[in-house]
Amino acid sequence: MAAKVFESIGKFGLALAVAGGVVNSALYNVDAGHRAVIFDRFRGVQDIVVGEGTHFLIPWVQKPIIFDCRSRPRNVPVITGSKDLQNVNITLRILFRPVASQLPRIYTSIGEDYDERVLPSITTEILKSVVARFDAGELITQRELVSRQVSDDLTERAATFGLILDDVSLTHLTFGKEFTEAVEAKQVAQQEAERARFVVEKAEQQKKAAIISAEGDSKAAELIANSLATAGDGLIELRKLEAAEDIAYQLSRSRNITYLPAGQSVLLQLPQ
């Protein structure tokens, strides 16, 4: 009797385990920011996109393919040539995500690694096309314009593959050794020219100052000559008195100087 009970319990447990396995295999989860495409072994890729949450499928017949629909960054380095045939090394940073409604087409025509298959090729194509419109110098001075044109063209091109580009930016821009040396030489020449211009301007200012000073001396001499012609010897005597007063004032402030009136003698007691 007990053996039959244990046998029944074992069969029930086995059936329960099998049922649990079947139910578990018929469930799948789609995490936040993700979408799922269903592949059916008999009908192929279904033209539906499954949203977030827990969903049912037919075990061993259907299989979910999960896609991350959140924005992801990718850096694409490209070596190309400018309009004036200078080598340009550019790195483009792209923030991309797939169009959720087009995931079945993306999976069917490109595959799960769509970003690896599409982004490097179209980025190289667009960058070469845009950079070839500008000289090397313009790529530096008009970098914002270049970045905007690359972004517009690349966004339009990526849309044909079912991709959305949230941001496109130039993060790295360098040139060949010859162009870099030419730019450095130009900067040195500009600095030397600026220094020479400063020296010339300084000399001009000094020249003007000397002219102004000479004109002032000439004017002062003219005024003195006119004063002498008008006042005669009286002006000279006045200047002598002013000079004598100034000398007397300076002597009175010194303790080591003795003033001796004229016509008087001073006896000095010398040692015998």
From Swiss-Prot:
<feature type="modified residue" description="N6-succinyllysine; alternate">
    <location>
        <position position="202"/>
    </location>
</feature>
<dbReference type="GO" id="GO:0042177">
    <property type="term" value="P:negative regulation of protein catabolic process"/>
</dbReference>
<keyword id="KW-1003">Cell membrane</keyword>
<dbReference type="GO" id="GO:0060766">
    <property type="term" value="P:negative regulation of androgen receptor signaling pathway"/>
</dbReference>
<dbReference type="GO" id="GO:0042826">
    <property type="term" value="F:histone deacetylase binding"/>
</dbReference>
<dbReference type="GO" id="GO:0031100">
    <property type="term" value="P:animal organ regeneration"/>
</dbReference>
<keyword id="KW-0539">Nucleus</keyword>
<dbReference type="InterPro" id="IPR001107">
    <property type="entry name" value="Band_7"/>
</dbReference>
<dbReference type="GO" id="GO:0044830">
    <property type="term" value="P:modulation by host of viral RNA genome replication"/>
</dbReference>
<dbReference type="GO" id="GO:0010629">
    <property type="term" value="P:negative regulation of gene expression"/>
</dbReference>
<dbReference type="GO" id="GO:0040029">
    <property type="term" value="P:epigenetic regulation of gene expression"/>
</dbReference>
<dbReference type="GO" id="GO:0032740">
    <property type="term" value="P:positive regulation of interleukin-17 production"/>
</dbReference>
<dbReference type="GO" id="GO:0005654">
    <property type="term" value="C:nucleoplasm"/>
</dbReference>
<dbReference type="GO" id="GO:0007005">
    <property type="term" value="P:mitochondrion organization"/>
</dbReference>
<dbReference type="GO" id="GO:0046718">
    <property type="term" value="P:symbiont entry into host cell"/>
</dbReference>
<dbReference type="GO" id="GO:0070382">
    <property type="term" value="C:exocytic vesicle"/>
</dbReference>
<dbReference type="GO" id="GO:0034097">
    <property type="term" value="P:response to cytokine"/>
</dbReference>
<feature type="modified residue" description="N6-acetyllysine">
    <location>
        <position position="128"/>
    </location>
</feature>
<dbReference type="GO" id="GO:0006355">
    <property type="term" value="P:regulation of DNA-templated transcription"/>
</dbReference>
<dbReference type="GO" id="GO:0005739">
    <property type="term" value="C:mitochondrion"/>
</dbReference>
<dbReference type="GO" id="GO:0051897">
    <property type="term" value="P:positive regulation of phosphatidylinositol 3-kinase/protein kinase B signal transduction"/>
</dbReference>
<dbReference type="GO" id="GO:1901224">
    <property type="term" value="P:positive regulation of non-canonical NF-kappaB signal transduction"/>
</dbReference>
<dbReference type="GO" id="GO:0035632">
    <property type="term" value="C:mitochondrial prohibitin complex"/>
</dbReference>
<feature type="modified residue" description="Phosphotyrosine">
    <location>
        <position position="249"/>
    </location>
</feature>
<dbReference type="GO" id="GO:0005769">
    <property type="term" value="C:early endosome"/>
</dbReference>
<feature type="modified residue" description="N6-acetyllysine; alternate">
    <location>
        <position position="202"/>
    </location>
</feature>
<dbReference type="GO" id="GO:0000122">
    <property type="term" value="P:negative regulation of transcription by RNA polymerase II"/>
</dbReference>
<feature type="coiled-coil region">
    <location>
        <begin position="177"/>
        <end position="211"/>
    </location>
</feature>
<dbReference type="GO" id="GO:0098982">
    <property type="term" value="C:GABA-ergic synapse"/>
</dbReference>
<dbReference type="GO" id="GO:0009410">
    <property type="term" value="P:response to xenobiotic stimulus"/>
</dbReference>
<dbReference type="GO" id="GO:0140374">
    <property type="term" value="P:antiviral innate immune response"/>
</dbReference>
<dbReference type="GO" id="GO:0071354">
    <property type="term" value="P:cellular response to interleukin-6"/>
</dbReference>
<dbReference type="GO" id="GO:0045745">
    <property type="term" value="P:positive regulation of G protein-coupled receptor signaling pathway"/>
</dbReference>
<dbReference type="GO" id="GO:0098891">
    <property type="term" value="C:extrinsic component of presynaptic active zone membrane"/>
</dbReference>
<comment type="similarity">
    <text>Belongs to the prohibitin family.</text>
</comment>
<dbReference type="GO" id="GO:0046982">
    <property type="term" value="F:protein heterodimerization activity"/>
</dbReference>
<dbReference type="GO" id="GO:0070373">
    <property type="term" value="P:negative regulation of ERK1 and ERK2 cascade"/>
</dbReference>
<dbReference type="GO" id="GO:0071897">
    <property type="term" value="P:DNA biosynthetic process"/>
</dbReference>
<dbReference type="GO" id="GO:0001552">
    <property type="term" value="P:ovarian follicle atresia"/>
</dbReference>
<dbReference type="GO" id="GO:0005634">
    <property type="term" value="C:nucleus"/>
</dbReference>
<dbReference type="GO" id="GO:0001851">
    <property type="term" value="F:complement component C3b binding"/>
</dbReference>
<dbReference type="GO" id="GO:0070374">
    <property type="term" value="P:positive regulation of ERK1 and ERK2 cascade"/>
</dbReference>
